[in-house]
């Protein structure tokens, strides 16, 4: 059995991950961790996820359960994830990282850790989103510089980073396909007298409202026609199942920093 730990286990995504782990053949939840000030510490992780008792108590310290898992799934916050990364690197434990909002410097720390342990890091673990990334690469190469490119995304009111990591990843894929540097061509929102649009730019627009799980659309607009590639998530379970699939795929893999394109064989 693949022994899996979930950090942030008492949160919305954490509970969904617990359910996904318990549903996956050959996988089992053997550790669950949440923040030290959580009032739920000591509770059964299965009961937190409405699955019934599974005999895995919620811990407040990852260091206490390092011997109880093979791979850690972390969808928390950059500062928390980096601390957990240090523990896993020292202990030789694999990691699945779905946290977004990392700076360029913080992402480099993931690269360095990948020299010692196997890691799957992705802005989005949905199989559909990763298929969209493949389609975006093709669309950008075919349509080239003859289109204006705009990326819109919508998420629930609780999401703390914008644009979403998925939207930024989509922008990176498109920019790379066109030989552009996203940092130089990205435009984040528009207001006032902006002047005529520069076709080399890639625009981003963000919506935060209600309980939207995650909508992403990339628009390729030419004179006379438009192409839109859209993904809409209706449940967090799609991300959780992808993360568990990645955790199973990492079994026996050499140290390295992988992504979902590797897991799905889309590279």
UniProtKB/Swiss-Prot annotation:
Active-site residues annotated for this sequence: 155 (proton donor/acceptor), 159 (proton donor)
Keyword Electron transport in annotation: no
Presence of keyword Ligase: no
Residues reported to bind (S)-2,3,4,5-tetrahydrodipicolinate: 156, 165-166
Pfam family, one: DapB_N
GO cellular component, one term: cytosol
Pathway assigned to this chain's UniProt record: Amino-acid biosynthesis; L-lysine biosynthesis via DAP pathway; (S)-tetrahydrodipicolinate from L-aspartate: step 4/4
NCBIfam families: dapB
Name under which the protein is recorded: 4-hydroxy-tetrahydrodipicolinate reductase
Organism: Pseudomonas syringae pv. tomato (strain ATCC BAA-871 / DC3000)
Lineage: Bacteria, Pseudomonadati, Pseudomonadota, Gammaproteobacteria, Pseudomonadales
């Amino acid at each position: 059995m693949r022994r899996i730990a979930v950090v942030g286990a008492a949160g919305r995504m954490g509970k969904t991950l617990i359910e996904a782990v318990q549903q996956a053949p050959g996988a089992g939840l053997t550790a669950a961790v949440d923040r030290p000030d959580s009032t739920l510490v000591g509770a059964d992780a299965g009961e937190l996820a409405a699955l019934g008792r599974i005999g895995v108590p919620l811990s407040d310290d990852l260091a206490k359960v390092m011997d109880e898992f093979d791979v850690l799934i972390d969808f928390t916050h950059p500062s928390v994830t980096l601390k957990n990364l240090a523990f896993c690197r020292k202990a030789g434990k694999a990691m699945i990282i779905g946290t977004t909002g990392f700076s360029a410097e913080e992402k480099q720390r993931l690269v360095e850790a990948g020299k010692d342990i196997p890691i799957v890091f992705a802005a989005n673990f949905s199989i559909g989103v990763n298929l969209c990334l493949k389609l975006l690469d093709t669309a950008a190469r075919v349509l080239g510089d003859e289109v204006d490119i705009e990326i819109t995304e919508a998420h629930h009111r609780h999401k703390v980073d914008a644009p979403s990591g998925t939207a930024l990843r989509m922008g990176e894929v498109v920019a790379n396909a066109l030989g552009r540097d996203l940092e130089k061509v990205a435009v984040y929102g528009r207001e006032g007298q902006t002047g005529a649009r520069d076709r080399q730019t890639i625009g981003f627009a963000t919506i935060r409202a209600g309980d939207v799980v995650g909508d992403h659309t990339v628009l390729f607009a030419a004179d006379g026609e438009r192409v839109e590639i859209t993904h809409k998530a209706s449940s967090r379970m799609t991300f959780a199942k992808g993360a568990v699939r990645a955790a199973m795929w990492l079994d026996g893999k050499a140290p390295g920093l992988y992504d979902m394109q590797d897991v799905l064989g889309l590279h």
